A protein has these predicted regions:
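The feature captures the conserved acid-bearing segment of alpha/beta-hydrolase catalytic domains
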Residues: 55-116
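Alpha/beta-hydrolase fold nucleophile elbow
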Residues: 22-37
Length: 126
């Protein structure tokens, strides 16, 4: 391939490795993930790729891909905007139990994703 993974992809991979480790612990039935501050979007990205390994996710949307102005930014992910940015990636987490710790309103696309999955909509912390 000749190309390195973006740093944010490496971070999401590290989180996925931690999720797999937690799932393999003796007597481990539930895995909850919290991504706070700058790591919120990393956790959302990992959760979208976790294929049902998580029980719940608490995260914030501290930034969005559309805010990144430089391809050298550590959180730049090629193609992220084609996926719908953070909203599209977050929608891929449905039907995971999700609580967002920021006060931004829920995008209608998120509500639609959880509704289509037959799950309770994400919660937004007051």
């Amino acid at each position: 391939t000749g190309y390195n993974r973006a740093l944010i992809a490496e971070r999401a991979h590290d989180i996925l490795t931690a999720i797999a480790w937690a799932r393999d612990l003796p007597d481990s039935e539930l895995v909850h993930l919290a991504g706070l501050d700058r790591a919120g979007p990393w956790a959302i990205l990992a959760a979208a790729l976790s294929e049902g390994a998580l029980t719940s996710l608490v995260a914030n949307r501290s930034w969005g891909f559309e805010e990144l102005e430089d391809a050298r930014h550590p959180d730049f992910l090629p193609g992220a905007l084609r996926l719908g940015g953070m909203t599209g990636i977050t929608a891929a987490c449905a039907p995971l139990a999700l609580e967002l710790t920021d006060d931004a309103p829920l995008d209608p696309a998120l509500l639609s994703a959880w509704r289509a999955a037959g799950a309770a909509p994400p919660k937004v912390a007051p």
